[in-house]
């Protein structure tokens, strides 16, 4: 039972780290990255659809993306979705493809992006600590119900703390890498 709690907690912490990593990928760094469009939705036959599912996105140059819609009729809605997103980019429509030039980030904008990255990292660490708290509550309940002794539960709590520290450290590393990437000119 203790092993199940530890395994479940570790799995949920791992998922949280992965979610945080995916969140940080969407932060614009001044380099072209197709993943920056993962959260951009366009109306497609009345259904909000990610533009990554409506088009192919390629990176011909370090600061340019080319978006080629699978259906030319969806070009306008994709263009509007990008323009209305909070990415701060402006697509150019040449009739066949959309070209998106990624502007160089200003020092101030870089610092803002670092703050956003740190905020997302902190959210990830809070989620990990919430998983830890829930695991601790489950362990205490096992002890209270008399299923396991104090020593076994204390050892499990210590193990849960080690697991928590490991995943919090992973989030810190991911955020530090993103910060370095953002501050690189």
From Swiss-Prot:
One annotated Gene Ontology cellular component of this protein: cytoplasm
Compartments in which it is found: Cytoplasm
GO biological process: translational termination
UniProt-recorded Gene Ontology molecular function terms: ribosomal large subunit binding
UniProt KW keywords: Cytoplasm, Protein biosynthesis
Signal sequence residues: none
Organism domain of life: Bacteria
CDD domains: RRF
HAMAP family per the UniProt record, alphabetical: RRF
Purpose: Responsible for the release of ribosomes from messenger RNA at the termination of protein biosynthesis. May increase the efficiency of translation by recycling ribosomes from one round of translation to another.
Family of this protein: Belongs to the RRF family.
UniProt protein name: Ribosome-recycling factor
Species of the source: Corynebacterium efficiens (strain DSM 44549 / YS-314 / AJ 12310 / JCM 11189 / NBRC 100395)
Lineage: Bacteria, Bacillati, Actinomycetota, Actinomycetes, Mycobacteriales
Gene label: frr
